[in-house]
A protein has these predicted regions:
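Terminal low-complexity/charged segments
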Residues: 1-167
Length: 167
């Protein structure tokens, strides 16, 4: 399916199709991300190169948050980005871990740093911050210098000391 025809195939799911740096971007209503991504995978976009989130707090856009899926079709070497928009009140999308196993840790990272939940994920727990960490540090409304929580992080001692050079 050419990406130019995807809006015709999913008229209720696709907000628009744009292009940046000669690569297409498909803007999707969040609740339809799994349907659209499943179709794209069956049409040859078989590799999830990256999955990340965007906080549009100061940028505007369809919703405050978007999850960007960067896909690659190995057969044609074509790249494609799908941006699934997440309403701030819901902060939830269907997980794509069933389509691409490498989405496992990437979805956990987005959950940990932005607070976006991925429904159906097999193990959605924090991956970088302590499990009792309060907040989501990559959100634009998170204090730039933190909330003094770093003073409570455990200190990890190095198992060795640097040796002094003798000449």
């Amino acid at each position: 399916m050419p990406h130019s025809k995807i809006k015709e195939r999913f008229p209720d799911a696709i907000l628009e199709v744009t292009e940046f740096a000669a690569e297409p971007i498909i803007h999707v209503k969040g609740q339809h991300n799994l349907t659209v991504l499943t179709a794209l995978k069956s049409d040859g976009y078989n590799f999830l190169a990256d999955l990340t989130a965007i906080d549009n707090l100061t940028l505007g856009g369809y919703e405050r948050f978007a999850v960007a899926y960067h896909l690659l079709c190995h057969a044609s070497a074509q790249r494609l980005t799908v941006k699934a928009y997440v309403p701030e009140k819901e902060l939830s999308l269907p997980s794509v871990e069933s389509l691409w196993k490498n989405a496992d840790w990437q979805e956990r990272e987005v959950f940990d740093l932005y607070g976006i939940r991925f429904e159906g994920h097999p193990n959605l727990i924090r991956i970088m911050n302590p499990h009792d960490f309060d907040g989501y540090p990559l959100r634009k409304d998170y204090p730039r210098l933190g909330r003094k929580e770093r003073s409570d992080f455990p200190v990890i001692k190095r198992p060795f000391k640097k040796e002094k050079r003798t000449e």
